[in-house]
Structures are given as structure tokens and as C-alpha cells.
């Protein structure tokens, strides 16, 4: 056949040359067939540079399926694993080295790195249960594994031994989903033993977050004293009050008092005892049998009791800061009329949440937190129908996104200040119509009762209130005639007020808070202008000093502290109801605008507590 002389291009044909056998004479048909050479020639298209590719998507699955069939029928297998585990009967599993090596770096090293197993047809395996090995071999061929819940720990341990990371991750994810108070410590210990960092971290985080429930379980009582000290020393332990930690330690000791009574002192030093109330300490010193039998521990707590009741500044461990979202809550406020809004700002991502409204609109109220619950205290309902001063106390639960009414105060209090000592709310000053109060009353949440305490030395509305070293400070305000720069301090043990150094500036409606053992007073109204100046009171030197001013003048502002920084929200600048939010960094002595409220307002109640349950709310992402 002669070659076709036509040029390449559309309609180009192929040239076929005759096949010529390269077989030696007499080699046989089979050999001749295998060695036949194709010499077909193809004339390319006019494009000339095209490529052809083809992928069979299911090839790997099909190939491994066939190899698994070969394994099950014991064909072409080149290794037998002889698995022996403790007293369990030995088992043999035939397999293909290449498949095992493809799924496990341990098997790959065993069969390719010149180890003695590389040339062995029977390999002895110890330290893993035959049923676990059977499942891991099945996974190598099928990429699928299933087991009962009780077997997960054993399979995960085997997967760790043979470095089958995908199985380790799957088991870890399953165990994370199974975490509950009764098994979290056991899972954490298991993860630590096998070196699974992620599972260990997730289990520990669960323990920290649910400490109160975990501390009631059998696993908790089986902790060693070193493990318990490490646990209760965590700053991120999530407890409503430090007495939970104290009781957990005492109960742990009682579980085996004869052996554990020697560890009481070490445990108490890990408890944040300065966060316990004097009343609680006094009761434990009187009634706790374990403390009665240990004079050193008793003396240690007596010393702390004295420091608390003498209001001494102490170098103590920091307050616990659980890794649960803590948001800045703003309740009520005023813009043309009193508002019922409850909103929460998340400084970590800049978002606002709209939550359950106050049952009655209020401005000039105060906010505080006790045991994770947000309280809205006093204020006034300014509405087109009239103005009504409020004696109300309402409690908001972030877990249910609901308000509940509590016992009202003895008198209505608008432009009130509040502070919390030993879990009790102190309502300070305020006004009822033209009456300017110097009276103060204390609310006990356990009893839902208010009781009057000693009145202030000065009548004050628009008063700033803060608590430091268990002392209640009332700063500035208006007495009905004059705006004030004076300040006074309440001693709960003596039930008396004492004047302290006056501020440098007259301030009514200032924002007052505590940061790093100092009292800050920001903004306010001096009788002529709204202020942007800020001053700080050092309780050691008993002096007020100015710090950097805010970027905006504001009175009737909201103020709080979040993660070591001061936040001021809203207020009135003399012309406008502000929506701006500023943040003060004490390390750099600077203010910065961080966000805007959803609308301008003054006279809000502000406090910080846990993030609300997302199932109960609809999140509103507010952009500034």
C-alpha cells in the first residue's frame, strides 16, 4: 500500500503499515501475539496540538473493591497478620501489604524500610485487640468503618497506634458529640494518654464550661489532688460564684476524708477565696467539719475574712474569665421618650443583638449583674401620656431571653446609681418627682427582699456608683440645688458613709466604673456644659488625676468595663442624643470610637454578662 499524498487537515486519513512480527522462528503463537508491534500512523488534524485524556471516576473504588474481594477469598494475599492481645484468642488476618501500607504509615514503614517484616509472610502483632485490627483492615480496603459506642475508644487507640489519622479524627468528632458531665473527665484523660491534642482540648473546655455539673459526677471524685488543683486554678472556669469551687473541693475531700484531708490547704490556695463573701467564709469557719480539724486552713481563711472586712487592697488571683461570650448589654434609655430596648454589643465581632424588650419603657435606670443575671433598676417612664418614676426591679435571664419582675424598691428612683457587694444590689439616691434621695437600700436576690441601709451624707441624683474592695462609692450628682464634685464611701460592716477626696471637676450624670483598682469618672454635666474630661481616683493615694479625655462630650452616658477596657455608650452632648461608643485603653491612655449604637439615646442601663442563648433570639447584624 502506497502512502496517501494528500496534506494533513480536514478529512486527513490514517496510514496503516503492515504488521511485521519480530518473533524468532518457532517461538509460538502466544509469544508472537504478545510481541506484535503496531505501526499504524495517524495524520494529525489541522490543529495538531490537541490532547486527549480520560478519567474513570470510580476506578479507585472499583479497584479496592476487587482487592477486598481477593482478601476475603484469600487470593493474591502476601501477608498474614497474627494478632495477639492479652488473654483474647489470637486471630489471623490475610491481607495485601500494598493496601495496608497505603492506609497506615506504620505498615508502610514495616513493609518498605528494610525491616525484618518486609520479607515475612506471617507478621506477629501485639498490643491491639483482634476485633480492632479487623476493623482497621476493613477500613484500609473499604474506606468505611462502623462500631458500637463502647468500641470507639479501642478503635481510636488502635488508629493512633497505626497513625490512621482519618479514623482518629472521625472517632474524635464522635466522642466530642458524646461529651456530658458524667464522661468528660474520662474522655479528657483518655485523649491525654493517647496524645490526641484536639480531643483533649475539647474535653477540657467542656469541663471548664460545665464545671458545676461535672463536679457532681463520680469521675470528678476520682481525680487526683494534682489534677483537681490544676483544674480549679484555671482562670476560664465557668462558675456563677466562687462558692461553687469551694464546695466542690470540700466534697472531693469528704469522698475519702482519711486520705485527702492532707490536701485541703493546697486546694484552698487554688480557690479564689478573696472572691468569697465574708458571710460565706464566716459560715464555713463555724460549720465545716474539715476546716475545724485543720488549724492551718482555718487560720488561712480567717486572714482572708479579715482582709475582706477591712477592705484592704490585696494582690490576689484574677477573677475568673470563662471562655463564654460576654457581651455589653444596654437597657432602656431616652430619645424623645423613654425606650424599652434591650440590646447587646459583642466587642469581639462588632455585632449588636436585639433582645426581649423591657416590660415598661424606662430611662434614667441603672443596670447590674448578679450570678449571670441582668437587673434593671429604677428609672422613669417618660411618655406622651405623662412621666412616671419607677421603683421597679426586673431580672433578665440570658438563657431564656426573658424578663421577670422582682420585688420593687421602697421608693421610686429616677437617675439612680447601683453597685453590687457580696451578691447584693445597692440602690443609691435618685429622685421621685421633686424629692432628691439620699436614701440607700439593699436587695437580696435569694430572698427577693429590699432593706434600707444607712443614707448618704448628701442627696444625689445622676450619681455615679462603683464598688472597689467591697466598698460602695457614690460620686458626683445633683442635690437639687448644686451639681457636685463631692464623693463618699459606704462601709457595709459599719453601715456608715464617709466623705472622700472630691473630684477635680463638678459632674452630674457622669459615668463611673472601676478598672485596675482605680475609680474612673467620665463626662457628665457641670451646670454649664457637657464634659468629655475623665479623671481617676487612686484609693491608695486618695487622689484624683486626669487621664485622656473622650472624643465626645457626653452626660447621662452608659459605662462599663469589658476585658480590661472601659466602654462608654450614648449620652447627650448638649445638642444631640449620641449613638457613638468609645473605648478606653489604660495601657496607652487613649480613647477610640469602636462602633455605633442602633440609635442615639441617653440614660441607658449598662452591664456585662454572658452571651444569650442563640436559640431564643434572632440575631441582628448592625453595620456602622
Curated annotation (Swiss-Prot):
Name under which the protein is recorded: Kelch-like ECH-associated protein 1
Phylogenetic classification of the source organism: Eukaryota, Metazoa, Chordata, Craniata, Vertebrata
Consequence of changing residue 333 to C: In a NSCLC cell line; strongly reduces interaction with NFE2L2/NRF2 and reduces repression of NFE2L2/NRF2-dependent gene expression
Record organism: Homo sapiens (Human)
CDD domains on file: BACK_KLHL19_KEAP1, BTB_POZ_KLHL19_KEAP1
Expression sites (tissue/organ): Broadly expressed, with highest levels in skeletal muscle.
Molecular function per GO: disordered domain specific binding; identical protein binding; RNA polymerase II-specific DNA-binding transcription factor binding; transcription regulator inhibitor activity; ubiquitin-like ligase-substrate adaptor activity
Pathway note: Protein modification; protein ubiquitination
Gene behind this protein: KEAP1
GO BP, sorted A to Z: cellular response to interleukin-4; cellular response to oxidative stress; in utero embryonic development; negative regulation of response to oxidative stress; negative regulation of transcription by RNA polymerase II; positive regulation of proteasomal ubiquitin-dependent protein catabolic process; proteasome-mediated ubiquitin-dependent protein catabolic process; protein ubiquitination
Modification after translation: Non-enzymatic covalent modifications of reactive cysteines by electrophile metabolites inactivate the BCR(KEAP1) complex. Accumulation of fumarate promotes the formation of cysteine S-succination (S-(2-succinyl)cysteine), leading to inactivate the BCR(KEAP1) complex and promote NFE2L2/NRF2 nuclear accumulation and activation. Nitric oxide-dependent 8-Nitro-cGMP formation promotes cysteine guanylation (S-cGMP-cysteine), leading to NFE2L2/NRF2 nuclear accumulation and activation. Degraded via a proteasomal-independent process during selective autophagy: interaction with phosphorylated SQSTM1/p62 sequesters KEAP1 in inclusion bodies, leading to its degradation.
Family of this protein: Belongs to the KEAP1 family.
Amino acid at each position: 500500500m502506497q502512502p496517501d499524498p494528500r496534506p494533513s487537515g480536514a478529512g486527513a486519513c490514517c496510514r496503516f503499515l503492515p504488521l511485521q512480527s519480530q518473533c524468532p522462528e518457532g517461538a509460538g503463537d502466544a509469544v508472537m501475539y504478545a510481541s506484535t508491534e503496531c505501526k499504524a500512523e495517524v495524520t494529525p488534524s489541522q490543529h495538531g496540538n490537541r490532547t486527549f485524556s480520560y478519567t474513570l471516576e470510580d476506578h479507585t473504588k472499583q479497584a479496592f473493591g476487587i482487592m477486598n474481594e481477593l482478601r476475603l477469598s484469600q487470593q493474591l494475599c502476601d501477608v498474614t497478620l497474627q494478632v495477639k492481645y492479652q488473654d483474647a484468642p489470637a486471630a489471623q488476618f490475610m491481607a495485601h501489604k500494598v493496601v495496608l501500607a497505603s492506609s497506615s504509615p506504620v505498615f508502610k514503614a514495616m513493609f518498605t524500610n528494610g525491616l525484618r517484616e518486609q520479607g515475612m509472610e506471617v507478621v506477629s502483632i501485639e498490643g491491639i485487640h483482634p476485633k480492632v485490627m479487623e476493623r482497621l483492615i476493613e477500613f484500609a480496603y473499604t474506606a468505611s468503618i462502623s462500631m458500637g459506642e463502647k468500641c470507639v475508644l479501642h478503635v481510636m487507640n488502635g488508629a493512633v497506634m497505626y497513625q490512621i489519622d482519618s479514623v482518629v479524627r472521625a472517632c474524635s468528632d464522635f466522642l466530642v458529640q458524646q461529651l456530658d458531665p458524667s464522661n468528660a473527665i474520662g474522655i479528657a484523660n483518655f485523649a491525654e494518654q493517647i496524645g490526641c491534642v484536639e480531643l483533649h482540648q475539647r474535653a477540657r473546655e467542656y469541663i471548664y464550661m460545665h464545671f458545676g455539673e461535672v463536679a457532681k459526677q463520680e469521675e470528678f471524685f476520682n481525680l487526683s489532688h494534682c489534677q483537681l488543683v490544676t483544674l480549679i486554678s484555671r482562670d476560664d472556669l465557668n462558675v456563677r460564684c466562687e462558692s461553687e469551687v469551694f464546695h466542690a473541693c470540700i466534697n472531693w475531700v469528704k469522698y475519702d476524708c482519711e486520705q485527702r484531708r492532707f490536701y485541703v490547704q493546697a486546694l484552698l490556695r487554688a480557690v479564689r477565696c478573696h472572691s468569697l463573701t465574708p458571710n460565706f467564709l464566716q459560715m464555713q469557719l463555724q460549720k465545716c467539719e474539715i476546716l475545724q480539724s485543720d488549724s492551718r486552713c482555718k487560720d488561712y481563711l480567717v486572714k482572708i475574712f479579715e482582709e475582706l472586712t477591712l477592705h484592704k487592697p490585696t494582690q490576689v488571683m484574677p477573677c475568673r474569665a470563662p471562655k463564654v461570650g460576654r457581651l455589653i448589654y444596654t437597657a432602656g434609655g431616652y430619645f424623645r421618650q423613654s425606650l424599652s430596648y434591650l440590646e447587646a454589643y459583642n466587642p469581639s465581632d462588632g455585632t449588636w443583638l436585639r433582645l426581649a424588650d423591657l416590660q415598661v419603657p424606662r430611662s434614667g435606670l441603672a443596670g447590674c449583674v448578679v450570678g449571670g443575671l441582668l437587673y434593671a433598676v429604677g428609672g422613669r417612664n417618660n411618655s406622651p401620656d405623662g412621666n412616671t418614676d419607677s421603683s421597679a426591679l426586673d431580672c433578665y435571664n440570658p438563657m431564656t431571653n426573658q424578663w421577670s419582675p422582682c420585688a420593687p424598691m421602697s421608693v421610686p428612683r429616677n437617675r439612680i446609681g447601683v453597685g453590687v457587694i457580696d451578691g447584693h444590689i445597692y440602690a443609691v439616691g435618685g429622685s421621685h418627682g421633686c424629692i432628691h434621695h439620699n436614701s440607700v437600700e439593699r436587695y437580696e436576690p435569694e430572698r427577693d427582699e429590699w432593706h434600707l441601709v444607712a443614707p448618704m451624707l448628701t442627696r444625689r441624683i445622676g450619681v455615679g456608683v462603683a464598688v472597689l474592695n467591697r466598698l460602695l462609692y457614690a460620686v458626683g450628682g445633683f442635690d437639687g440645688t448644686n451639681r457636685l464634685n463631692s464623693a463618699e464611701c459606704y462601709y457595709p460592716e459599719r453601715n456608715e458613709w464617709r466623705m472622700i477626696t472630691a473630684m477635680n471637676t463638678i459632674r452630674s450624670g457622669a459615668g463611673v466604673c472601676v478598672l485596675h483598682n482605680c475609680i474612673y469618672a467620665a463626662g457628665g454635666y457641670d451646670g454649664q456644659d457637657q464634659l468629655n474630661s475623665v479623671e481617676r481616683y487612686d484609693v491608695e493615694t486618695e487622689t484624683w488625676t486626669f487621664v485622656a479625655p473622650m472624643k465626645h462630650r457626653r452626660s447621662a452616658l452608659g459605662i462599663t468595663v469589658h476585658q480590661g477596657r472601659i466602654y462608654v455608650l450614648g449620652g447627650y452632648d448638649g445638642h444631640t442624643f449620641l449613638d457613638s461608643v468609645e473605648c478606653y485603653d489604660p495601657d496607652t491612655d487613649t480613647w477610640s470610637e469602636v462602633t455605633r449604637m442602633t440609635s442615639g439615646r441617653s440614660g441607658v442601663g449598662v452591664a456585662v454578662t454572658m452571651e444569650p442563648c442563640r436559640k431564643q433570639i434572632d440575631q441582628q447584624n448592625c453595620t456602622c
